């Protein structure tokens, strides 16, 4: 099977206690994992803590684990102590309450970078749609980010996208001193 890398890879030192990566934007539905210097038990999610009951990746080869990939373009942001992000009319926000999300401008420099700094691995706490008379047909999510202090208005002209955020947690019951887990989002294609 052929692989194409997506985004930057992550390496985590394996120890006898659970170690969790920084959050990353989910840009692919496959996560390739290689363990060196000791078998690794792996947990993936919004706030994972690996245990020896989780999925095992041995030093004998790599494993490809599935993730849920979700994203949506953002056309509006309502600032406040919590922040409301709107999808284009006629579309939905695929995120659920409890998910974690990250805003990315994907090269767009029209918006204040404070939005991406504050809306980074932030928990979704609400979801709404106000369709109907007096409504706007935009589905919205509310996140825990406090953007009340951002002085610049959000500009929808550009590629502002909200991505699902995940973390990876690993643990090894008997790692060597140089034990490391390498993690990379990949796209897979047919047979190699």
Please give the residue ranges for each predicted region:
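Short proline/glycine-enriched turn/loop motifs at strand-loop junctions of beta-rich domains
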Residues: 28, 34-41, 90-96, 176
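Short, surface-exposed beta-strand/strand-loop-strand elements in extracellular ectodomains
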Residues: 37-53
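Small/polar beta-strand repeat architecture
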Residues: 71-181, 190-192
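Beta-sandwich interaction modules
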Residues: 22-23, 60-70, 165
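Short, surface-exposed beta-edge/turn micro-motifs
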Residues: 27-30, 39, 122, 166-167
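C-terminal interaction-tip segments
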Residues: 1-14, 172-192
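Terminal beta-strand-rich extracellular "head" domains
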Residues: 48-64
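Surface-exposed ligand/attachment interfaces on beta-rich extracellular proteins
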Residues: 4-27, 49-51, 82-91, 111-115
């Amino acid at each position: 099977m052929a692989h194409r890398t997506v985004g930057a890879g992550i390496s985590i030192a394996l120890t006898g206690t659970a170690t969790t990566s920084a959050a990353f934007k989910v840009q692919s539905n496959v996560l390739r994992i290689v363990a060196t210097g000791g078998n690794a038990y792996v947990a993936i999610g919004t706030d994972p803590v690996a245990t020896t009951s989780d999925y095992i990746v041995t030093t004998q080869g790599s494993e490809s684990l599935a993730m849920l990939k979700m994203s949506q373009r953002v056309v509006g942001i309502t600032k406040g102590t919590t922040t409301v992000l709107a999808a284009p009319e006629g579309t939905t926000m695929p995120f659920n309450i409890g998910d974690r999300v990250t805003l990315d401008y994907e090269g767009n420099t029209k918006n204040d970078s404070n939005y991406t700094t504050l809306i980074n691995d932030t928990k979704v706490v609400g979801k709404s749609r106000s369709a109907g008379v007096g409504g706007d047909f935009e589905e919205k999510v509310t996140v825990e980010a406090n953007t009340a202090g951002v002085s610049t208005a959000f500009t929808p002209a550009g590629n502002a996208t909200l991505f699902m955020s995940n973390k990876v947690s690993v643990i090894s019951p008997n790692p060597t001193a140089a034990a490391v887990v390498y993690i990379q989002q990949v796209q897979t294609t047919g047979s190699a």
